[in-house]
Each structure stands twice: as structure tokens, then as C-alpha cells.
Amino acid sequence: MKELASGAGAKVVDVVNQQLTKPTQTYVGKGKLGELLEIVKREKIDTIICDDELKPTQQLNLENALPGTKVIDRTALILHIFASRAQTHEGRLQVDLAQHEYLLPRLAGQWTHLERLGGGIGTRGPGESQIETDRRLARNRIAKLKKDIEKVRQHRQRYRQRRKRSNLPIVSLVGYTNAGKSTLLNTLASSAVTAENKLFSTLDPITRKISLRNGKEILLTDTVGFIQKLPTSLIAAFRATLEEAEEADLLIHVSDISHPNRYEHCHAVNEVLGNLGLTDKPKIGVLNKIDLFPKNYQAHEDTSLIKLMDQFDQTVFCSAETGFGIGELINVIECRTSEH
């Protein structure tokens, strides 16, 4: 969560944890609420970020209990990061839809809600209250965005059909955000895809034709990075993008093995793949960023790494940054796509 907050440009001053048996009206218990109030006053905090999706009433109650603060939940934070990363028309459409669907139940009757989203201002109908007008405008915007995204989906489907006629194997890179997928695509394709040390630096699928050593060619696609507790609204909004993984003949699941939560990240990716019905899709596990380990690192003695490796039928250690292990990965890709 700290990594997400930093990725959104926030300075994390303090972290407060609590386990509750059931949700409260303010998201936290009374004692923890008092602790938060003390921290807010002492550190002059202006923003509280919660690592869950809050109900609209919880968000409002928490803001009222902590005067002068803005309360943001996990979904809003992820949407903010996605919005700042979206570069293409398709990416912006998908983020815009997810934002509107998130904010619709949170509209409080102020025009500023829709102005923040870039929505248009309409004429209020006879006997229509302000909040009804806001909601009508939001629903109209959502309907239009869904139509536009459906056009994008159909365009992608036609494009994929043309690709299939080429009879080239399709390989998709999947993985947790910032695992190194774009860098790996660059290394394999010697292309100039954006590869930054940022969360969600890739929101739109990018496909490159790769020539393998055996003379055969494949189509390699980079996809949007996954994340733990990925909001359902985002999965739905990015369906057109995620369909790239559905159409693949082979998935390359890239994991950042230098990250302390590498197993949890792997599980989160597998969970999303399961939701998409891709659990049984052929996969290669790429254990990336091995260059960040000391030279005397003994992988076979690392029980947490062994646990991670058990998630895959086949794994390859590599560094997309230095090129270590890329030759072995290419050999594995050649072998796994040779029957296509």
C-alpha cells in the first residue's frame, strides 16, 4: 500500500493497522479513530488512505470524524494512478469508465463531482433535484463510455482475427505491476516500448513480432500489470485489454523475485487469471530481476522462492535489465510454441 501511495505522489507519514471482526460506520474502531485524530493533529495530515474499498457512508463518516482531511480508499488511489498513466484514447476511455462507475454512488449533489471527471453540464429536468441531475449525467456518460469501449473491443477482435490468420503463435506477458514486463519485451524485441520503474506504466497492450533463433516468429504482447485486490470495476473496464491474454497460445508470467511480497504478488496475478478463466492456459514462470541478488545467492535454499516456483510447471531465472537468462528463456519459448 505504501508503494501505491508513493506511486500516486503521496508522502507517507505514518501507517496505522487494525483488524476488525466486522466493519464499522467509520471503517475503524473508536479507539483507533482517536489514535488517527491525534496523528492528524500532530503531523498536520491532510489525506487518509485506506487499504480497502470504502462504502460511501464510511468515507463520509471518516472525513467528518477527522476534520480537514480527505479520505481516499484503495480503489480511488488505483484509479488516480491509472488516470495519470493513461496515454492513449483507449486507455483514457477505460479509466474514465472505471472512475464514473466508482463515483456514481458517491455523488452528493455538487456539480464539482462531474466537473472533476470532465463530464458535461446538462439542463435540469422539471422537478429534478440536483443529485438526480448529477446521477443522470453520470449514467449517460457511463452508457456512452461503454458503447465507445465496445467499439474498441470489436476493433481489437477484428485485429486479433487478422493476427490469427497469420498463423503465428501468440505469447502474452502477464504479471504484477512493475515486475519488468515492458523491459522484458524490449529485451526480446529490441524495441522502444516505455519501460519505467513505475506502477502501471503500461495500460494498453503492445504487440511486437519476435524472430526466434530457430527461424520461426511469434507475436509477443505486453499487458496491463495486475495488483492485489484489483477493483472489480477496473477488471470490467479493462476487459478489452485483458482479452489479449485470453487469446494467447502461451502466457509468460513475469515475477519480480527481488520483491519481499513476491509470493503474494504471484497469487494475486493467478487470482485474476482465474477470474478470466485462464487458469489452465499454458504458462512459463519468468523469475525476473535476479541481478538484484548477491552473486553467492543460493536459490535452492530459499524456501519462499521454492514456494513461488511451485506455482509453475516450468520456470526461468533471468534479468530483463542485464540480459542474464534471456537465451534460456528464448529456448523455452521456442520449445513451447514449436507445436503451434
Functional labels for PLM-detected ranges:
Residues 2-170:
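Conserved P-loop NTPase architecture
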Residues 67-119, 126, 279-284, 291-340:
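Canonical P-loop GTPase G-domain recognition
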Residues 19-21, 53-56, 76-79, 224-227, ...:
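Conserved nucleotide-binding/hydrolysis micro-motifs of P-loop NTPases
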Residues 22-26, 85-89, 130, 192-194, ...:
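Flexible beta-alpha connector loops of hexameric P-loop NTPases
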Residues 2-6, 37-42, 54-64, 69, ...:
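Conserved C-terminal guanine-recognition region of P-loop GTPase G domains, centered on the G4
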Residues 16, 203, 210, 316-319:
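Hydrophobic residues at beta-strand termini and immediately following loops
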Residues 1, 48, 100, 138, ...:
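Residue-level signature of catalytic and energy-coupling elements of molecular machines
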Residues 113-235, 242-246:
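Conserved G1/Walker A P-loop phosphate-binding module
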